[in-house]
Amino acid sequence: TVTATHAGKSATCTVTQSAGEITYGAWKVTITANPTTIAAAGGTSTLTYSAVRDVLTNGVVTSTEKATPTVSGSATGFTRSGATVTAANNTSASSRSVTYTATHGGKSATCTVTQSAGSKQYGSWSAWTVSVSANPTTIARTGGTSTITASATRTRTWTWNGVSGSGGTESEKGTPALSASGSGFTLSGTTLT
């Protein structure tokens, strides 16, 4: 209210300002992962996500409003607890990935976490184990034959990505060379006469 006064007389007038208008900008949603690639043997990645929008007074940005978006997404081999993504040992020769989506106020954003392909890690071969047997083990005095059976095997252990307990054992077979000694015997292939 403005008052004008002169010679004992006065007059007033009032100026009114309209109420301020509060409006909001669109939500801006972001989500990132660090790291974006996890080793084949397993590990973790941390998600960072947020939702922000401008608050405007009479069309002028005066502050921002923040919120926590909803995060969704799943894939085999991955688990999420809050912002922590855990990848299990990848027992596959292919890489794998999971995509997470952060959503709030009708807006969304995505990020992808990838796990490297798995590979088999081998130990050293064991020494060869050689066995030989004859059937029969006794030949009549009049002569006859015996069949010789021989084998050679060796083993080694393996794991996926060096993670203990994730693999197994494999074996390899060989063919031993046969020879015979002793008077009165001949060996042809696996037949002893």
Name what the model sees in each region.
Residues T1, G82-S97, T191-T193:
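Extracellular/luminal low-complexity segments enriched in Ser/Thr/Pro
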Residues T1-G8, S94-G106:
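A short beta-strand micro-motif common to beta-rich folds, especially ectodomain repeats
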Residues T1-W27, S188-T193:
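Low-complexity/repetitive intrinsically disordered segments
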Residues H6, Q17, N89, H104, ...:
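Residues on the solvent-exposed faces and adjacent turns
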Residues G8-C13, G106-T112:
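Extracellular and select intracellular beta-sandwich modules with Ser/Thr-enriched
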Residues T12-T16, G20-E21, G25-T70, G118, ...:
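Solvent-exposed, low-complexity, repeat-rich "mucin-like" stalks and linkers
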Residues T68-A83, I139, G167-L192:
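Low-complexity "stalk/linker" and mucin-like segments enriched in Ser/Thr/Pro/Ala/Gly
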